Amino acid sequence: MTYCNKSNQTSYPFILPDLPYDKESFKPHFTPETFDYHHGKHHNAYVQNLNNLLKDKEELQKKDLEEIIEWSSQNSNAAIFNNAAQIWNHSFFWHSIKPQGGGKPSGKILEQINKDFGSFEGFCEQFKQEAVGQFGSGWAWLVYHDNRLQIIKTANAGTPIANGMKPLLACDVWEHAYYIDYRNKRPDYVDIFIKHMINWKFVEDNLIK
C-alpha cells in the first residue's frame, strides 16, 4: 500500500522534492527565509543523511521510502527511521499547505469533520490543542483510522504511516517550521496554519482515495 504518491519516493538515491509553489507566495504569513531554511536546509539534510546511511545497504536501496520507514520501524533502526520518516513527513507537509489556503472547507471532508468532531469549529479547537500541546518537537496530524477522522500528535520523526494510519493533513510543530517568523509563539503559528495555509483539496483527495 502506498499512503501518498506525493510523499513516497520509489528508490535510492532519494532527492529533495521541489516545493509545489513559489515560496514568495506565503507572504505576509511566512517569509521566503523560512522556506529557505525549512526546505532547503532541514529537509535537504534528512535526504543527504538517509542516502549516506543507505550507501552500503543494497537491499534497502531497492525499497521505496515508505518500505524503508516500515523496515526501520520494525527493526528498531532509529537513524534510518528518523531520516526516512522526516523526508516523508516534510514532503507530505509541503502538500498540506498552499498559498491563500485555510478557512472552512466544503464537500466530503466537511461532512466527515462535522460527523466526527461535531462542527468545523470543534475540529479547529481540537487540532490547535493537539498541535500546541505537543511537548518539544513533533507533528500534529489529521488521520482517517477505524472509519473516522482522528487528530493525533507524534514526537520527533514519528509518522502515522508507521502505525498503519492513513494521514490526511500534517502540521509541522518543530521549531524550525516557525521560529524565523513567529519565534516561540507556536499558538500564533498554528492559528495561521488553520486560517490561511491548509490545502483542503489535498486533505479531501487523501480522504477519498
Swiss-Prot record:
Positions annotated to bind Fe(3+): H38, H90, D172, H176
SUPFAM superfamilies recorded: Fe,Mn superoxide dismutase (SOD), C-terminal domain (SSF54719), Fe,Mn superoxide dismutase (SOD), N-terminal domain (SSF46609)
Function field: Destroys superoxide anion radicals which are normally produced within the cells and which are toxic to biological systems. Catalyzes the dismutation of superoxide anion radicals into O2 and H2O2 by successive reduction and oxidation of the transition metal ion at the active site.
Similarity comment: family membership: Belongs to the iron/manganese superoxide dismutase family.
Domain of life: Bacteria
InterPro entries named in the record: Mn/Fe_SOD, Mn/Fe_SOD_BS, Mn/Fe_SOD_C, Mn/Fe_SOD_N, Mn/Fe_SOD_N_sf, SOD_C_sf
Cofactor: Mn(2+); Fe(3+)
Record EC number: 1.15.1.1
Cofactor note: Binds 1 Mn(2+) or Fe(3+) ion per subunit.
Protein species of origin: Rickettsia felis (strain ATCC VR-1525 / URRWXCal2)
Any one GO MF annotation of this record: metal ion binding
Entry keyword Cell membrane: no
Catalytic activity: 2 superoxide + 2 H(+) = H2O2 + O2
Disulfide pattern: none
Protein name per its UniProtKB record: Superoxide dismutase [Mn/Fe]
Enzyme class, spelled out: oxidoreductase
Binding locations of Mn(2+): H38, H90, D172, H176
Record keywords: Iron, Manganese, Metal-binding, Oxidoreductase
